[in-house]
């Protein structure tokens, strides 16, 4: 693993960049305050823009740490307005692996944008940051997230039945993964 931190990434339609404190209102409006947008993530809606500001302030501070990876997802045509985020949510240095998590404003679902962002981050983590393995997981009640992972080139690795307490219920979750060697195979 090579600790390179969160650097900006451009794709066909997106700019993935570090969060700025000025992103708080857009994040709050676009997804952090919307319960309908948060059905399948581990955290609850932010009660106020202040909660969002505090989260972003922590992230901005963490950008000093070169093993902190968290990108604001923006449309290239509007790089000052965040529509989602994607980040490394867990790391296992012993096996040179990490897990990614992501969220996208519901207003942008079904357009291929999350797949585009995930593909770019997988390349960054496997080639540039030199992780050997990247995984992602989702509650099986959200099969669209599994399709995003598959379209981004990740392979299905298994389902853990009744393995996570999520939003007041015990649920199943599935895991997808990719190795550096998978990326090299194309």
In which residue ranges do the predicted regions lie?
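A short hydrophobic/aromatic micro-motif that marks alpha-helical segments and, especially, helix-coil
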Residues: 48-50, 63, 168, 183-184
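Short, surface-exposed helix-loop/turn micro-motifs enriched in polar/charged residues
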Residues: 43-44, 65, 96
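Acyl-donor (CoA/ACP) binding surface of acyl/acetyltransferases
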Residues: 1-26, 30-36, 74-186
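Short, conserved alpha-helical segments within structured domains
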Residues: 44-48, 69, 141
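A short helix-loop-beta-strand connector motif used in the catalytic cores of GNAT acetyltransferases and
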Residues: 58-72
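Conserved GNAT-fold acetyl-CoA-binding loop/helix
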Residues: 37-58
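Hydrophobic residues in alpha-helical segments
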Residues: 31, 41, 63-64
């Amino acid at each position: 693993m090579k600790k390179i931190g969160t650097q900006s990434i451009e794709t066909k339609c997106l700019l993935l960049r570090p969060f700025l404190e000025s992103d708080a209102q857009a994040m709050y409006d676009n997804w952090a305050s919307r319960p309908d947008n948060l059905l399948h993530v581990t955290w609850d809606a932010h009660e106020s823009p202040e909660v969002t500001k505090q989260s972003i302030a922590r992230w901005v501070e963490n950008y000093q740490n070169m093993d902190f990876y968290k990108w604001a997802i923006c449309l290239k045509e509007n790089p000052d307005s965040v529509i989602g985020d994607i980040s490394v949510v867990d790391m296992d240095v012993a096996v040179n692996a990490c897990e990614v998590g992501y969220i996208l404003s519901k207003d942008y679902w079904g357009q291929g944008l999350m797949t585009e962002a995930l593909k770019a981050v997988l390349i960054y983590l496997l080639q540039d940051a030199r992780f050997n393995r990247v995984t992602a997981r989702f509650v099986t009640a959200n099969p669209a997230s599994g399709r995003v992972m598959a379209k981004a080139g990740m392979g299905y690795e298994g389902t853990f039945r009744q393995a996570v307490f999520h939003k007041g219920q015990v649920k199943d979750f599935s895991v997808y993964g990719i190795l550096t060697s998978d990326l090299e195979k194309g």
